[in-house]
Amino acid sequence: MKILVVNCGSSSLKYQLIDMTSEEALAKGLVERIGIEGSILTQKVNGEKYIIEEPMKDHKKAIELVLQALVDKEHGVISDMSEIAAVGHRVVHGGEKYASSVLINDEVMKALEDCVKLAPLHNPPNIIGINACRELMPKTPMVAVFDTAFHQTLPDYAYMYPLPYELYEQNGIRKYGFHGTSHRYVSSVASEMMEKDLKDIKVITCHLGNGASLCAVKEGKSVETSMGFTPLAGLAMGTRCGDIDPAILLFMERELKMSPDEVDTVINKKSGVLGISGVSSDFRDIEGAAEEGNKRAKLALDVYHYTVRQTIGAYTAVLNGVDAIVFTAGLGENSAASREEILNGLEYLGIKIDAEKNKQRGKQIEISTEDSKVKVFVIPTDEELMIARDTKEITAK
């Protein structure tokens, strides 16, 4: 059984064709600059690149070219489109309606439209991608897999903001959380590595990329997470501010005479480690600058590591203890220095790190010592595989 996994952005599209017998990706691809000049599709099969450069006025044209690349006689991996058993779509926001992945039909599409106000940047391109696939592959079943779904198990006291209750009732203002597919995947892999049932362990998962969030997993369910109503909340990130005093936004508007759009740009695109360091939102650049003595770069890293460490401490309280901590995503998988700094100060939990193992980059490994009371893992995330598994399970019903 072969499943196509699609992740649509506003002007880009990522895809993988996964053979579910071996759970291996037969092809991986990226389409960039959809709807703008210089559109390009890059597909990788067994390390070989295949590139298509031609105008793509919209996502439908992009998906046409994806399908063309997959069946290409020389560079493709399937002989006919009928070999694609189903398509799994990443959808950022499922609101309160979806606590798990779902087979797409007209009713689901309407619900996704209703969620646009909750994710105005992300859901529209997700919807456009689904519609394009449905047009081009009308007989192929499609499944929506939501970033928010895993966190729908949060207890009400964890997701409710202390605002007038009507704002929740009438406008859906509450904590939703994101990166759910990643947190779900790495927590399940951690349980396999520990040879324990996920229901019997308490895990804190740290998805640390340009966007970053933590999740507390108890009995296999998300019970707390750091992102909120939007992916802006929680930790300091690459360009996002994370949790700050909300009155700062009023100060920016009233005293500094900034418009709501200007404030939005500052807190989403000019803050985080970029804002503090003035160097970059790329942690490799900031680490390099800090090593060369740039004080603001070092401060940016210190603030970042502190917010992650602080949140791990809080989630240990939420879980009443912790059995495993997992690092994943770009920084979590590749920066030994960041992992070390984050865990420095959590010795009271009985965490002991093996310095040699911690030097490993981007591979699945336990980095704690044998006598560490808390297991610490680095687990490369695989959201595409998780989407494919859900798609297989739902279309088999």
Swiss-Prot record:
Protein name, UniProt field: Acetate kinase
Domain of life: Bacteria
Reactions listed under catalytic activity: acetate + ATP = acetyl phosphate + ADP
Gene3D superfamilies membership: 3.30.420.40
HAMAP family: Acetate_kinase
Enzyme Commission no: 2.7.2.1
Organism: Clostridium botulinum (strain Langeland / NCTC 10281 / Type F)
One of the Pfam families matching this protein, by short name: Acetate_kinase
Cofactor(s) required for function per UniProt: Mg(2+); Mn(2+)
